[in-house]
Amino acid sequence: MDIKKLQDYQKHIRNFSIVAHIDHGKSTIADRILELTDTVSERQMKNQLLDDMPLERQRGITIKLNSVEVKYHAKDGETYIFHLIDTPGHVDFSYEVSRSLAACEGALLVVDATQGVQAQTLANTYLAIDDDLEILPVINKIDLPSADPEMCKNEIEEMIGLDASDAVEVSGKTGQGIPELLEEIVKKVPAPNGDLNAPLKALIFDSKYDDYRGVVLSVRIEEGTVKPGDRIRIMNTGKEFEVTEVGVSSPHPVKKDMLIAGDVGYLTANIKSVRETRVGDTITSAENPTEKPLPGYRQIPPMVYSGMYPVDNQKYDDLKEALQKLQLNDAALEFEPETSQALGFGFRCGFLGLLHMDVVQERLEQEFGMDLIMTAPSVDYHAIMNDGSTKLIDNPADLPDAGEYKEVQEPYVKAEVMVPNDFVGPVMELCQRKRGEFVTMDYLDKYRVNVIYNMPLAEIIYDFFDELKSSTKGYASLDYEITGYRATDLVKIDMLLNKEPIDALSFIAHREEAQNRARQMTTMLKKLIPRQNFEVDIQGAIGAKIISRATIKPYRKDVTWKIHTGDPDRRAKLLEKQRRGKKRMKAVGKVEVPQDAFMAVLKMNDDDIKGK
């Protein structure tokens, strides 16, 4: 191993991430960089090339971080190795951003020249500052008529505190400014400085399951080197494996003889079980281990919980295996087994938000062929029991009877809404309607305001974002963080079908809204549950008290069609027999409940509740 050659190679490595608010053009800039450096041919090139998950291409958003190695021939005559990591912009996937930043020395901060700094721009920049990265401001979409690069530079300086006087102005669409951006990356992003002679120390920042090779680990080598044949140890589990292949993504896998300190690539080692590694673990050499593991990642707790059940109960084990494989590729997903009287065996899953929940469901259906029933999402509540203990409630059906607890606490968030001046009124009205408490309002410039409210997370996770977008014509951006739990007057509403409680339809609501919400839920269920051969009574109840009711009339078969019109006794007998049969059927009949009904709570917006 020629150490001088390796050190020279290391000096030419540049590891950087692209961070921005959603839709500010990160993936388009990544496309232009790949094109300009001839990493992919014109024939292979397609929009959002690094968004290789079918779901990303369908939705037009980045969901997963993705890394690629690019060779760039700079103006100084040297060839540089860029490891570019594209990251998501949606608040639900900020965990993916924090993981990708840990593998870098620099970050391109992309700001849309027509929109300026937005909520997630700030959130992602603070993540990069926390990781002590070199930040390069980039103003994108300068080809648009409404672009205002100077306004963006002022905002970056005033709101973030970064010098943006030499921010690179680019157009991801036309490629304008991309050559200058590549030169700036060479000059400003520092080379990695890991010790090549030290014992191997590598961070697992992502992973996926391959049916032929087992677990494929995405790694950033911090110190030392690794090559096929080396024995490695996962420091968290103590498990040892022999490396079978190392390489980089360019953007398709390319095998290499060795990965060295500073490299970002992949590694396989016949790891067959998804439980043997975890994102954030440190890999070291089995023969010459390092003393201390890398700090890893702060585990982000789920914000939203939902029940997930296979339509066919025989597929329970298949769903468990699919969730384990998906968790390998989606470290923020959490799940544990649960049983529902209505739906059988399934899992209680924790997600970072509703978009994350939708994405997990769609990936399970598309990639693993699962047919699923999802229950309505809820947040986790704390029930303070009479004996002083705290019980975590992530399923509304588990909330004990009112006499067993002193109070119920729900999670609160600090919500920051960036909005143009013209829409401050509608935003404040929306926040107050959602039980928000006004904190402060900061004027960012002549045109925009940052409105801050304390709000219950339960109000945010349903349709707050959609209502915010519609009340501000799409101009508002939202960021929020959990601030703690507060005691609130909450009650559990059970939904009963023919006097049988359906645990998967239970939900928790504020007492003042309980009757309206229960009434709305019974109306929704009446619309969504198809008619049966027997009458279906739908009731909403708090404890033993029924607070709402609706009835689905049965189909009625004409049992009198054979009878002569002049035989009223016979007619009455047949109708009475039909009534008795329906009564018996109602007592033993199983009501068919469609998937839509389990998500009915999501369709209950405020206008419906107020009966407008």
Swiss-Prot record:
It is a peripheral membrane protein. It catalyses: GTP + H2O = GDP + phosphate + H(+). Its EC number is 3.6.5.n1. GTP binds at D23, H24, G25, K26, S27, T28, N140, K141, I142, D143. It is found in: Cell membrane. Its main location: membrane. Residues 11-193 form the tr-type G domain. GO terms for molecular function: GTP binding; GTPase activity; ribosome binding; translation elongation factor activity. The keyword Membrane applies. Keywords: Cell membrane, GTP-binding, Hydrolase, Membrane, Nucleotide-binding, Protein biosynthesis. GO terms for cellular component: plasma membrane. GO terms for biological process: positive regulation of translation. Belongs to the TRAFAC class translation factor GTPase superfamily. Classic translation factor GTPase family. LepA subfamily. Required for accurate and efficient protein synthesis under certain stress conditions. May act as a fidelity factor of the translation reaction, by catalyzing a one-codon backward translocation of tRNAs on improperly translocated ribosomes. Back-translocation proceeds from a post-translocation (POST) complex to a pre-translocation (PRE) complex, thus giving elongation factor G a second chance to translocate the tRNAs correctly. Binds to ribosomes in a GTP-dependent manner. HAMAP family: LepA (MF_00071). This is Elongation factor 4. It comes from Lactobacillus gasseri (strain ATCC 33323 / DSM 20243 / BCRC 14619 / CIP 102991 / JCM 1131 / KCTC 3163 / NCIMB 11718 / NCTC 13722 / AM63).
